[in-house]
Each structure stands twice: as structure tokens, then as C-alpha cells.
Amino acid sequence: SWCDPATLKYVSGITGCRAMVKLQCL
């Protein structure tokens, strides 16, 4: 899941993580 910190970090690091969280989690 994108909301998962581990997954987000693995996907695109910190920058990508923030973008994914805003697009997916929100």
C-alpha cells in the first residue's frame, strides 16, 4: 500500500513518498 511508510520509502524515497501519500492516501 502507498500509505505504508516502508513501501513509500521503497517506491521513491522521501520526495516520492510525500507525493504518493497526498495522491493515494488523500
From Swiss-Prot:
GO molecular function: alpha-amylase inhibitor activity
Highest taxon of the lineage: Eukaryota
Compartments (UniProt record): Secreted
Keyword line: Alpha-amylase inhibitor, Secreted
Keyword Secreted listed: yes
Chief location: secreted
Keyword Secreted carried by entry: yes
Family: Belongs to the protease inhibitor I6 (cereal trypsin/alpha-amylase inhibitor) family.
Free-text function comment from the UniProt entry: Alpha-amylase inhibitor.
Protein name: Alpha-amylase inhibitor 1
Originating organism: Saussurea costus
